Each structure stands twice: as structure tokens, then as C-alpha cells.
Amino acid sequence: MSSATDHTSTAILAVDTGGTFTDLLLLADGVLTTLKVPSTPADPAEAVLAGSRKLLTEPRPHRLLHGSTVATNGLLERKGAQVVLVTNRGFEDVVEIGRQNRPQLYALVGHRPPPLVAREDRVGIGGRLGSEGEEIEALSEDELSALRDRVSHAEALAVVLLHSYANNHHEERVAESLQELGLPLSVSSRLLPEYREYERTSTTAVNAYVSPIMSRYLSRLDAESGAEAVHIMASNGGAVPVERAIREPVHTVLSGPAGGVVGALAWAKRSGFDQIITFDMGGTSTDVSLCPGRPLHTREFEIAGQPVAVPVIDIHTVGAGGGSLARVDAGGALRVGPESAGADPGPIAYGMGGRELTVTDAHVWLGRLPAEAFLGGERALKKALIEEPIEALAESLGKTPSEAAEGILAVANTAMERALRVISVERGFDPEEFVLVAFGGAGALHVVELAERLGAKRAMVPPDPGLLSAYGMLAAPPNREISRTLLISSRDLDLEMRLETTFRELEAQA
């Protein structure tokens, strides 16, 4: 559909790829045109390009803004590259030892996700720097020559040496030696020149792990989209050039959800509200974030059990969405998620071969989704297909089919309420003082009950809530965050001069 806006006539195409649907907005000649197409998980670029062709019926100059889940899914599904990590001899296991905190504190046998880099792919070399960047042991040129053969089987390389935040010369020399292999190369002093070697190593390994898949994906979009410029939504709420996203894909691991937060806050402020809790319920998961006038950021973030020490919008995610699967466990309890029907085959009501009940099917059974209005009328929902599975579930629960459907929604709401309380009540914020902003394809169907459970007095559903993350990309400013560790005593006579010099260098780099 289309709606008039006050924007300039510059053509901008914003695309948000979700687990179930890909959302597109075209802003051209003062008119905003929207489109939602099924995602293509096997080849995410296909849905983006196909949707773009539908909106851009004739070639015209335009810019592409894109939020992608490719890096996220690569990590969650462990479908990234084979990474070889080059580090100081004796420190090969830093990435596996990690910190002392344990996610399952009382488990008799704890389980931690394995590191992204296998033990045999962690290569230690000589050479050592001190904590102030002074050289203790020089690199061996003979060892660097032999190193190329030791890492040639890799699909991507990560270089992390101790104290490179204070002196990057050793890392740069190693990188120079490995460059001729032509492999994607992640260097910690370029990516995260900060102390704490575990977080720096983990972040660099994550970047290397998703680098090849993101490079292939974004390079194809850049080449085939026909856009004059391509910018990618970053996890911190800004937009970065596609070249940087290819080089540093770790900055895009929360790309899509960040767009939703930016878009929700923009709409809320237009409506006179600036204290909001965002509630983004899509087909696969639900993302929630608290914004006391602005998005909150964090640098203590984990994805798939891997610490990522880059700035991201503070977003909490649970595996409950419109496509979340409902089942009865061995103890007779009703469970919903985190498994999802995704875009293929999708919920049963889509008529695409799905056989397991989902949250969406429960809504269709209860008459909360009009069959003829799905995807703007392009596809009809098939309630009759749900009858047999919902009756089987109801029988196993000893309930009527409608009660079973209500139960599916209640279980999903409980998981989402818990996530909303984590970011509000558990952090000392009163939900009563915030507006709950619902978006995503399924958000509006659940927001009223969740607002009542939380005690929030107001709930807001923006126009086209299923497309709000794409709208957020239109509102996202270009930005570049640069950081560097500088260890210095407050008693140093040249403190102010060193700080001033460092800030000038950071500004020039940004």
C-alpha cells in the first residue's frame, strides 16, 4: 500500500529480512510504498532482490538500506566458516577457558557451547609485547613464512596477540604475512583495540566466523540490487556502508532488531511519548528493549554463547513468535517454542505443508486473523487444515479445541511477559511509566494482554506494525563508533595531552 509523506523525492529502499517474512519500504517522490514477501532462508538474497523488483517496476536511482539476519543465523545455526586463530604461543586456549561465570550455576554437569575455533585450528606463534606495548620478544620471520602453510586449510583467519591495543605492530606484521593467502582476515587491533584478551579474542573469532557468508551475501546484494549505495543496519542503531559490513560483520549481529527499536522510538516520539518498551514479535522470536527517552546500549552481549564486545542496543530475545511450534511434552505439559515453523513450511494455516501447530494457527482457529486479509489478500489462510491437529492436541490435554488454542497463546504470552519483566522490573523500572509499543507481524495480537499483565497503562500499535523494523532503517543515522584502550595514570604530567591526542586520532579514524 502507499501513503503520502513529507520526505524528499530521493528514492530510498529499506529492506528488513526476518525469519519468516522480508519487509520492504520504498520512499520515492514523497510516497511511501510497502511490501511484505516470504523470506527465502536457503538463499536470503533472493527474497530481497525479488521484492525489490516488485517495488522498483522500472530502473531508477536509489539507495538501499538493509537489516539482515544472515550473521545472526550463521552463529545460531553454527553454519559459519572454518576459522584458524593465530595467537601468542601458550595462549591458544584463552577462547575456550573464558571467564569463571557459568550460565548453569547449579547444574551437576555444566554444558557450555563449544568455541567457534576448534583446538587444532588455534595456532600459537612466538613474539610478545608487554602491557604498555613494549616489545619483549620479536617475531620470527622464519616462523611467519612457515605459518602460511599451517593455516592454508582455513576459510577465514583471525589474528589476536596480547596487548595489541597498546601496540599493533606485531598483529599488522602477521596480517601482512597472511594477506597473500587471499582469505578473509580479522585483526583484533583493527576490530576491537581494547584490553581483556578473552572478549577481544571471542569478538574477533565471531567476526571471522561469519565473514565469508556475509561477504558472499552482501557482495551479491551490492552487485545485483542496482542501488547507487548500500548501507547496512548496525547493531548499535546506526547505518554503516556495505564495505564496512563486509569487513566487520560482527557489527550486524543484531541488525534487524536494532531497526525495530529505532523505528518504534521514532513513531512514539511523533505521538508524544519518549519512554517506551518495545515489543517486536515476529514469526520466529520476540525482541524486547527498554528506551527511557533513547535506546540503551551495552557492550556485554552474548550470542550463541559467544561474547561480543561491540556496542549494541540492549535487546532481550525469547524464542516465541507467530511460527513457534506447540507440543505436549513427556510430562503432559503444553510447550510453545523455541522451535519455529519459519517461512517454509510455515504454520499449518498457510497451506504450504506445515503439520505442526503454531501460535499463528491458534489465532486463526479462534477467529482473530481474517482468512482473506493475509499478506494484503495475496494469500488466504486455511482454517480447515487446523481442525485435525488442534483436536488431537486438545484430546491429549483433556480440553476443547478452543481451550487448547487459548492455552497455546497463554504459554507464549507467559514467555514474552517474562522477557518484558527482565528488561523493566528486574532493572528497577516501573512499566506503568512506559508505553508498550507493539510491532512485528504478531505484536498487535498480544500487546493488550501483555500490557495488562505488566501493569502498563498505555499500549501503542504504529501504522504497518509488521514493517516497522524496515521503517527504522529509514530513520537510522549513519554512524561510526570507535574505541581504544588507553592505560594511563591520573598523575601523569602529560595526561591531558595524551587524551587530546587520542581523541583526535579517534575522530580522524571515524
What are the functions of these language-model segments?
Residues 1-510:
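N-terminally biased helix-coil "hinge/interface" segments that flank
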